Amino acid sequence: MEERGRRKPLYEMTRELAATARGDLPATLVIRDGTLVSVTSGEVLPGMSVAVRGPRIAYVGPDAGHTVGPQTTVIDAAGRYIAPGFLDGHCHIESSQITVTQFARAVLPLGTTGGFFDAHEITNVLGLRGLRLMLDEARSTPLAAYLEVASCVPSTSTELETPGAVIGPEEVAEALSWGEDVIALGEVMNFPGVVFGDERMHAEISAALRAGKIADGHFCWPPDDHRLAAYAASGISGCHEGTTPEDTLWRLRQGMYAKLRRGSAWHDVAATIKAHTERGLDPRRILLVTDDRSPESLLEEGHMDFVVRHAIAQGVNPVTAFQMATLNPAERFRVSHDVGSVTPGRYADILLLEGDLAEVRVSLTVAAGEVVAEGGRMVAELEPYDYPAFCLDTVRVAGGLGPEDFDIPAPGGGERARVRAIRVVENHVETRGEWVELPVEGGLVRLDPRKDVCKLFVIERHGRGGGRGAGFVTGLGFERPAALASTVAHDSHNLMVLGNSEELMSRAAREVVAARGGVAVAVGGETAVLPLPVAGLMSPEPYEEVARLSREIGRALRSAGCRMNYAFMTISLLALVVLPELHLSDRGLVEVGEEGFRLVGLAAEG
């Protein structure tokens, strides 16, 4: 990892650390007489102490008194556990709708001291400039933040969707040269492309492997046939898209790392962990990850502390659960020499925990040798980041946003139209395709108030051609006139507008454009707005304020009748055309079938 203020590479500190361990140099920090969670040996060891010199650990043992000098800070850990800081094995910071600095403020008090962050949201909007922005800001925080280079920009192809930028093998190779903290090729979402030999996908994977980096995965087909083997044989060695014990089983059998996800809206751990708890699979290649966490869930539930606690509640041994969130991700990403354990030479990313270990109650966080949080609050000040103008003006919508612009012409004649619709699935990333019959009036498809159907539009907002896709979505549960508009619309992040009232769809869309990006929900005469001006994805405001506004979005959706768990996160995937089964882009409806992707019409064929 590049030196980032507080963090120095090990090769610069070997003599200094050895001298501190001998007692010839004083430690800068000593944590005394705690119970060590040794993730490297699998033990829980009482009466242990840790001596730290600068950003790294010099000594771990029963007594660190020989390392204490006049200026050494000594923390008494009696009655508390000493554990390594948590690492998120797969996370999109942008999904929390807060900037990296605010993300660090939110998660450090919860015990997350680092992670492996795939910034493909902002890269789909701003290309390499966006990725570099995230990297530079991450380097200014106490986090051990390792970034992955977005692999699928766009997630499929420009024939199927319009992103704000396009990334190929040359861009991947360039970004991987930016430093050791650019750790991997991000999740290769175009799994059909990999399986069926897409040239761009394989060239990007090759670029990562040539650079000595790893490639991360995203595989959504059933795991027990030749396609997962083809995916793994292409050099992709980890995946977080499993939803069943069999998914975990087969990923491990194919030599991959299985990442078990518990995000705000993706509740997969309860099922996927059974491969370990019920079938006895070795946990050494199992990771716990969040993928996406909303700002209010960070505030109300937690981050990796919540996921570890949840895994323990499913029957995982507490030490094993800690390994899944510390040592295992560090080993998966080949950085266990720096992070993932409380052992000599590693960064001093250390937690003190109170109560029973299974409760995962973090009372103090040390990051790179500095106490950064205590009692659930930051004690270290983080400097605000100065965001450049190019990332604050990214919403460029061509065409109108009046009520009439949300009319959908009827496909064919007659008084009824049989049309495709996308059915959302609560707490899952995939959708289902279905047929619905709707009335036709004046040549336009109208909604039937007796049916749970909304209109759905995806409108290109990057100034790259002005495409506009139209369709229908079911399963939202709206019981009164309502609409939602958002520039958070994975993964191309165009302007998505849905609703059962053209007037309200127009109002919500205009509010989002006026805010320079964000989310708006219009219900009756009220409109809730969450401005996200940084690339149309994130707010630079304090995370507590963003969480408050995000709660208002959730309340507005519930007032309309949409009661799904963290409904916005599920809704934001309606344009993610790389996922099964049916999604909408600015180019139209895209179906993922056994042979890959295809554009399909709105009307019944034949």
From Swiss-Prot:
Family: Belongs to the metallo-dependent hydrolases superfamily. Adenine deaminase family.
GO molecular function: adenine deaminase activity
Pfam families: Adenine_deam_C, Amidohydro_1
Source species taxonomy: Bacteria, Bacillati, Actinomycetota, Rubrobacteria, Rubrobacterales
The keyword Manganese is assigned to this record: yes
EC code(s) of this entry: 3.5.4.2
Keyword Cell cycle: no
The protein's required cofactors: Mn(2+)
GO biological process: adenine catabolic process
Gene that encodes the chain: ade
Species of origin: Rubrobacter xylanophilus (strain DSM 9941 / JCM 11954 / NBRC 16129 / PRD-1)
Name recorded for this polypeptide: Adenine deaminase
SUPFAM superfamilies: Composite domain of metallo-dependent hydrolases (SSF51338), Metallo-dependent hydrolases (SSF51556)
